[in-house]
Amino acid sequence: MNSIQPEHINRHKGSVFTLCTFFCLYIAQAVPSSFLSTALQVLMRENNFSLTTIGLLQLVKLPWIIKFLWAPMIDRRCVTVNDYKRTIIVSELIYAALLLTIGFLQVATDIYFIIFLVVLSLVTSGTQDVATDALAVLTFKKSDKSMVNSMQSMGSFGGALLGGGVLLMALHRYGWQTVLPFLAIFVLIALLPLLFNKHLTINEKPKETKAKKADFIWFFTQKGIWKQIVFLVIYYAGIFGTL
């Protein structure tokens, strides 16, 4: 009995740490993207850009809409926990580097280059999201998936609160060149739990179960799949349309 109890405690601690790991990864995506999509609109308005141009700024979110296009490639390349970790870490390092670069630019004079870099940053964060979601699905049992899903929701909405609210106030006080480097550092710090998490384990996928190019087409030909797709589009459009 005494020998089992410490093992149970260690397993519980590992599960909590793993949940915290995924929360950090999800909030690392949400805070910078929420800040950029909100702050750029404010700064562009202050610099007298037209409302039409500001409205087109929403197109920077396109990478997150079409990230399913490169998701099968990530699934094929990632087999072990280390493969997923490597994909997430590289994506976040590039994400942080792009945020730092954006911080050296001026909205008034470099807006189009800034938008280009923001699009690239959302490509990298979208790639991180694909790998993180896959790792979460493979790490947790069916009965525990609701917990990691709650970490995703907390990270997304908490990130929107911090990025679109708190950091906007910080922007007014400290300026663009201070907040963006802070965001880059924040993204790097959010990687630390993943780096030190030794509890992540998955069953390695046999080669025959890896995603193939034909699976992309097969997915959309499943019976009843379009009803689910339409439901999810309307559901998430309603959620994010209010943010």
Predicted segment positions?
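C-terminal ends and interior cores of transmembrane alpha-helices
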Residues: I89-A108
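Glycine-rich segments within core transmembrane alpha-helices of 12-TM secondary carriers
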Residues: W64-K67, S146-L171
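Symmetry-related core transmembrane helices of the 12-TM Major Facilitator Superfamily/SLC fold
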Residues: V90-A96, T178-F196
